[in-house]
Amino acid sequence: VADVQVIARTQAWHFDPPDLETKATPILLELTNNSDRSIVVRYDHIALTDAAGHRIDVIPPYNVQGTVSVPVTVQQPYYFTSSYTYAPYAYRFSPTYLRSGGGYAGGFAYDPQYYQPYLTVYTDVALPTPEMLQRALNEGPIEPGAAAGGFVYFKKIRRGEQILTLHVDIIDQASGNVMGTANIPFVAH
């Protein structure tokens, strides 16, 4: 589209949740308006089509559904201690300020059967995550000389050697008319 640059990137999601692509297909869109008119970004004017012409609409970021599993870690644990030492095998998990004594020196057996399920804890988190919303492309105007970028989300696309085309309508803000459409082909593999 003349004077409006549209760049689309797949496999650009490197944020939380790290396994988002198992539930949705994020595509990073960057639009630069080099025209002398204000244009508008509208979700209902962004879509993918397959070779058969089937349309896959953008899912507004606040409507992405599903859950992903994320690891849970304690960032700043609180330890109350009074004349306390810790098991020798727990040294690497203990806060730095407790490490000076080297841990309990007596017999203290480690029971791997008990601790195995607790080594890594995962929890289900509902989509969309706060980071998905923060990194989403917002609907709205792009003034002349300005740019906007962010992720748009589609349903999970099955991998295979299918050709998909991303269609982004460039809409004139004043009239609401489509000035043109950027068509960007992709191979889903």
Language-model segment annotations:
Residues 11-14, 62-67, 186-189:
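A short, sequence-level motif marking secondary-structure junctions
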Residues 46-100:
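Structured domain cores in non-transmembrane regions
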Residues 20-28, 148-149:
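Short, solvent-exposed loop/turn segments enriched in Ser/Thr/Gly
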Residues 37-45, 58-59, 164-165:
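Short, hydrophobic/aromatic beta-strand segments
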Residues 14-18, 35, 137-141:
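Second-shell loop/turn segments in exported
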Residues 1-22:
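Low-complexity, acidic Ser/Thr/Pro/Gly-rich terminal tails and inter-domain linkers that flank the onset
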Residues 29-38:
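Asparagine-centered strand-capping/turn motif at beta-strand->loop junctions
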